[in-house]
Amino acid sequence: QDNGFKVRDEMGGAVDPDGLKEIEAAIPDLVEDIKFLSYEDADLQRLIEKFDASIDYIKHIKKLIDLGPIKEAGLMVVVDSMWGNGAGWFTRLLKGGRTKVLEIHNERNPSFPEMLRPEPIPPNVDAGLKFSKANQGDVVLILDGDADRVGIGDEKGNFVNQLRVFGLLAYYMLEVRGERGPIVKTLSTTKMLNKLGEIYDVPVHETGVGFKYVAPKMIETDALIGGEESGGYAFRGNVPERDGILGGLYFLDMMVKMKMKPTELLDVLFSKVGEHYYDRIDTLFSGDREEIRNTVKNAKPETIGGLKVTSLNDTDGFQYYLEDGGWLLIRFSGTEPKLRVYCETTHGDLVQAILEDGLRIAGLK
């Protein structure tokens, strides 16, 4: 159920929804109509080109970021590669200096033991955080299975949620590197980005959920940074696609340039935009999808979690904007029988109440 493949366009970014529909329309309906060719036969017919992409990738990375100061910073960097293809990359890129890199789950293993899924979100991150705490890590970099997403753990062994990481990376681009350009965000990620946009006078573009919406908008606007709620971030100068290795290196560079640990970086961010809290619930459902959708559509709540609802956005699911500048989003998974309920608020004590109200609105509580 988890197998599949990704399609990328000539820019290296996700194909937009219209392009995906064209590709899907060309897929034969019957398996017997598909032509098969073994790897061995394809290799003999010279239909497969083999090359080492790492050489050009490393050259490209070094054009985007000076690794020297990170190597000499004397950091203890813990990396959880989650048994995926990000294994060994940070060790390779940062060797030869005072900074040490300790890796766990750094062998490729498609069964992904010790975790529910190779995603850099709780509870999958717990092993890396525990290992870092035991080894006095300054930061934890957690890559997903294909290393296009990155999660962060702080120097105390606590997880830094993806919305806060997005806010920090945008702040780094705008303040530390002094760059300017649009920010592209999915509607399921943080409003801290909108506040940073106002402070630094850069436009913020909001899209539907998924990089199939983010990548085209980044190309269209020549965006400085783009990202989504799941921990995927893309940067100008790179392909318009998520890159967990580059995101991790930029985070380390921010620590080095600002001479701060992750908790201190968050304090700086919050001094600019205020403290924001986030959580999400994924719940399986067995009923009719349209029935649940209509239940949400007809709910029209006046308050959620005790906060007044100010407006509704139904671009991709149902997003209720709240009086504190926060939001609740209710939307279906595109691939599974799951309802996702997300929220962000400036009131840490209201997060669970907001999420529970979201389930009630959907008729699932």
Residue ranges and their predicted role:
Residues 107-110, 145-149, 187-192, 212:
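Acidic, glycine-rich active-site loops and adjacent beta-strand->loop/helix elements
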Residues 15-59, 155-227, 234-235:
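Proline/glycine-rich low-complexity loops and linkers
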Residues 1-10, 143-156:
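Active-site microenvironments of hydrolase-like enzyme catalytic domains
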